[in-house]
Amino acid sequence: MAAPRGPRALSAAAPGSGKPKLTHPGKAILAGGLAGGIEICITFPTEYVKTQLQLDERANPPRYRGIGDCVRQTVRSHGVLGLYRGLSSLLYGSIPKAAVRFGMFEFLSNHMRDAQGRLDSRRGLLCGLGAGVAEAVVVVCPMETIKVKFIHDQTSSNPKYRGFFHGVREIIREQGLKGTYQGLTATVLKQGSNQAIRFFVMTSLRNWYQGDNHNKPMNPLITGVFGATAGAASVFGNTPLDVIKTRMQGLEAHKYRNTLDCGLKILKNEGPKAFYKGTVPRLGRVCLDVAIVFIIYDEVVKLLNKVWKTD
């Protein structure tokens, strides 16, 4: 009789078996990358508006009166495609970001499941935290820094970046590799807390829905609702860190000595409400993007389970 295998990581499963059907981390990397790429193409306009509002500091004075005004001015000046300016830099980062996130989550959960192969909420939070830190260091910080610099540059009176690769070359030439890692501390805090909250909520809701039947099928609609709920929780939990991260990665990042100094200056000069600028567009984008990512991820894993046998 074959010896029992050690636990791997959670995936969409076929009903009827005792323990949950588990996913190989390699499948998680492929499914996560595909989900991340599709999601960002759908949701980028709300990300663009959110970033514009956060960069629109009161002292300038403000250029936009709100979300609708930001959209109207952008479309009037640059057409509908203006809402997709900076997409390339974010798309290049979104695919590896989701791949690293899900791959690391599944890898960590290999070692944190109980004897029944179940991942409880607390361990889901810890795995999510590890996944968030990994994606922040490997992908998010450099790509988000480039994205914010691109959007900020293209809304200036004299844009200097002619394209993604030209912009990256100029940033590295002028500031070195350090120029792509501005706001690392804020990014690690933001992504770590983001994924900790999301995977905690998602794991809790999955466990509640499936009850004692670990292999109860998850309908894509249910997965989407759970994902949107997890996304909303993460928005209210860490929007202040997102605001600080955006300021630290903008073209005026030199105004701040470090993450703490940035937070204190925002509080002193603009008040507590400034930490929640861009919350409404971010809430819509995050709920949609987390729902989309989890739906696509689960469905791709189901497909991979049919063609890639890892048990």
UniProtKB/Swiss-Prot annotation:
Location of the protein in the cell: Mitochondrion inner membrane; Mitochondrion membrane
Catalytic activity: (S)-malate(in) + citrate(out) = (S)-malate(out) + citrate(in); D-threo-isocitrate(in) + citrate(out) = D-threo-isocitrate(out) + citrate(in); citrate(out) + succinate(in) = citrate(in) + succinate(out); cis-aconitate(in) + citrate(out) = cis-aconitate(out) + citrate(in)
Main location: mitochondrion
Solcar repeat start and end residues: 23-111, 122-208, 218-303
Region of interest (Disordered), residue spans: 1-21
Transmembrane segments: 29-46, 86-105, 129-143, 183-202, 224-241, 278-297
Keyword Mitochondrion in record: yes
Record function comment: Mitochondrial electroneutral antiporter that exports citrate from the mitochondria into the cytosol in exchange for malate. Also able to mediate the exchange of citrate for isocitrate, phosphoenolpyruvate, cis-aconitate and to a lesser extent trans-aconitate, maleate and succinate. In the cytoplasm, citrate plays important roles in fatty acid and sterol synthesis, regulation of glycolysis, protein acetylation, and other physiopathological processes.
Protein's name according to its UniProt entry: Tricarboxylate transport protein, mitochondrial
Organism: Mus musculus
